[in-house]
Amino acid sequence: MDADLYQVIYIVTFFSHFGAVRYKQLCQQQGVSCRMMPVPRSLSSSCGTCVRCEDRYLPPDGPCFDEIEQIAAWDGQQYTTVYHTDAQED
């Protein structure tokens, strides 16, 4: 498959709805194309809101990023975990 035919979508999940709202605002300020949406069932069984970013995302550091639960990349077929809070704990 030609890489130019699709873009990577990043799904960023949060511990709270407020975290999602703040992250979306920061993305928009940085020129990152994003929108809020329900969390896909394959990423979480809990009801919640996530931010969908196209082509790039803001990394999990800086203001409000303690609200990020995980970042997953969707390549058109499957999700791959890019960042997860549990993986960062020692």
Predicted regions span which residues?
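A short alpha-helix capping/helix-coil boundary motif
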Residues: 1-4, 38
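Short glycine-/aliphatic-rich beta-strand segments at the starts of folded cytosolic domains
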Residues: 3-13
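A short, structural micro-pattern
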Residues: 6, 45, 65-66
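Residue-level marker of intrinsically disordered, low-complexity segments enriched
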Residues: 7-9, 19, 30, 37, ...
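Amphipathic, hydrophobic secondary-structure cores in small proteins
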Residues: 11, 17-61
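C-terminal structural segments of small proteins and small subunits
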Residues: 57-90
